[in-house]
């Protein structure tokens, strides 16, 4: 579960909070290390923080979340009685003739879909934060489903995003 500030805690496990994942703390140092060892940033992540199947689970959940939200048309829980709009945005995108407008509508639909699933109490990936839980899933979904990027490419991109998040934190 999230304890805020980008940190998570697994019930029953000892906390690794405060433990450095990487030996370098500045992007300049990481880039120099990668250049000296002829490696990509995602390879650097693998070297110090092998994520294995975990990143696949993250990606699968992001895709499942967007797919789920695109199917729903109900009202979100709470006193505001907000109507879900992701499915409607996706339908507008499907009818759109302009490629640029279609792309914008699809990205909005996917982001709303994940955010609406979050607001509706579904399981979501809340990275980098709960408030922006629609951003990364929408991009992962779009690049995989619409642009045909491979799972490996997206997985490596998520690793690099995590590296940057770790540097910023």
For the regions a language model picked out, list residue spans one by one:
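Accessory "access/gating" subregions that flank catalytic or transport cores
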Residues: 49, 53, 57-167
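Mobile "lid/hinge" segments at catalytic clefts and subdomain interfaces of large enzymes
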Residues: 1-53, 57
